[in-house]
Amino acid sequence: MKNSIIKSAITCLLLLSPSTFAATDIIGGEMEFKGVVVAHGCTIVAGDENKVIDFKQISAKDLYSLQKSNPVAFSISLENCSQDIYKSVTITLDGQAHSTMPNHIAVTGSGSEDPKSIGIAFTDKAHNIIELKKPSAPQQLNNKRVQFNFMAYVEATSSAIQNQTILTGPFQAQATYTLNYQ
């Protein structure tokens, strides 16, 4: 009988939770894991993620006589391109569309005249107007660098020229570009 009491006592002790004997509670927490798996064919060259195209000073006289400024060249370059996932890439330019000039982006200004009097247009190296929201011709990916070359210019509206209301003073505009891999 003594043996059965000892066995019962040992069994009861073994069945008790280890937390019963702990002096303090064990504190824990949760973990969350997240991320994004991407399939980019290239890396944007440092400095080309956010471009600043500076027209410097544009003469209102030139806009009245020529209707547009001299073009400013710029490029968006990609490096570390691989054909493992994609074979080509296009680029799409976009921005707040000008209200009266198709394929021009609108400007904001703090000058003395209406900022709607001018807009900014993009061209390729052959001076062909680039349509906003339309992908460029595809460029083949290689193991080197891919470069998209553009030009931008400021153009005055015909009504601003006729009414002598071209914006004078500082102006700015925002545009975006999107890379589309195929």
From Swiss-Prot:
It comes from the Bacteria. Residues 1-22 form the signal peptide. One of its GO terms (biological process) is cell adhesion involved in single-species biofilm formation. The keyword DNA-binding does not apply. It is found in: Fimbrium. Transmembrane segments: none annotated. InterPro entries: Adhesion_dom_fimbrial, Adhesion_dom_fimbrial_sf, Adhesion_dom_sf, Bact_Fimbrial_Adh_Pro. Keywords: Fimbrium, Signal. The keyword Signal applies. Pfam families: Fimbrial. One of its GO terms (cellular component) is pilus. Belongs to the fimbrial protein family. This is Putative minor fimbrial subunit PmfF. It comes from Proteus mirabilis (strain HI4320). The gene is pmfF.
